[in-house]
Amino acid sequence: MVNDGLIELGNANVKIAVQPKAGASLAYFKANIGAKEVDIMRPATAKALTDSDAAGSSMYPMLPYVNRIHDGFFVYWGIKRQVPSNVSSNKEPFDGDGWKFSWNVKEKSDKKVVLTTVGDPKKGFPFSYEAEVTYTLTDSGFNTHIILRNLGILPMPCAMGVHPFFPKTKDVNIKFKAKNVWEHLGTPLRDKPYNVTSDWRFEEGKDIAKMTLDTCFGGFDGDAEITWPSNNVRLKIKAYEEFNHSILVVSENKNIFSFEPVTSAIDAFNLASRGIMGTGIKSIGPGETIEATVEFSVEEL
């Protein structure tokens, strides 16, 4: 169903609402657990719905880069590439171009929505590209499939990911496995990967409600679980193909948190230009594509 710019997909178990005009974001992801409806992701705020602002959504795609680009530039093929700020409160560009665009609906059915957009190198990321995001409803959740295509005549560096916002209950627990964590100290931030120590091990699960962190993990194996015991629900995340990094952001003073499957480290363009290995940055030639999928599925405890 299409309602005020929202495209709603649902079945007896779950439902989502896609916002083409708000960066191909989601307005909600809800599940029927027992006799009640539970918000699996933070519902879009009223202001975000009015303003078509993905920042206040349930989830948005990040492309053609993820998180921040330090000081708004990077060097590629020996050329300094400027990337303008896209957030008024931050001098550095943030989370790519896609979440700021109004997307076109390419295909729509009861179970699937396909959205497309084109990046203008004169206004944002300094390379020409086409992006496609597909949301497909499943019996227990939905899948997100992202495709990036280089429309230019030169190789294009790129990264992508998804940025969901989750409710932070007092008992929320997250479980995932990673091989390393990117350093927090120094300028620019997060410029070295270190082997994961016990403080950063989440494979057995950790309660995160009282944590404060903004951390990128490398060597992410693609599987994660978020459990809300008080809501009697668990979310399983399965990230495929290129999603070998993840970012966990938690603030003790906020009632939401994010766990973001991504293809690269934070500020990866600049890290790679300095010869740092393992950043996850990809380079695609003219006409070439990169694509990856993330699955979200809900189960009752």
Where in this protein do the model-derived segments appear?
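Acidic, contiguous internal or C-terminal segments within carbohydrate-active enzymes
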Residues: 9, 20, 33, 117-158, ...
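Extended, loop-rich substrate-binding clefts of extracytoplasmic carbohydrate-active enzymes
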Residues: 8, 79, 84-139
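Active-site/ligand-binding surface loops and adjacent short beta/alpha elements
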Residues: 82-83, 155-156, 165-241
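Acidic/His-leaning functional-site neighborhoods
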Residues: 91-106, 173-174, 208-279
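Short Pro-Gly-centered flexible turn/kink motifs
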Residues: 74-82, 146, 282-299
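Short, Gly/Pro- and small/polar-rich lid/capping loops
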Residues: 1-12
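Acidic-aromatic substrate-binding/catalytic surfaces of carbohydrate-active enzymes
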Residues: 19-80, 86, 258
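A short, structured loop/turn motif at beta-sheet edges
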Residues: 33, 75-79, 105-113, 136-141, ...
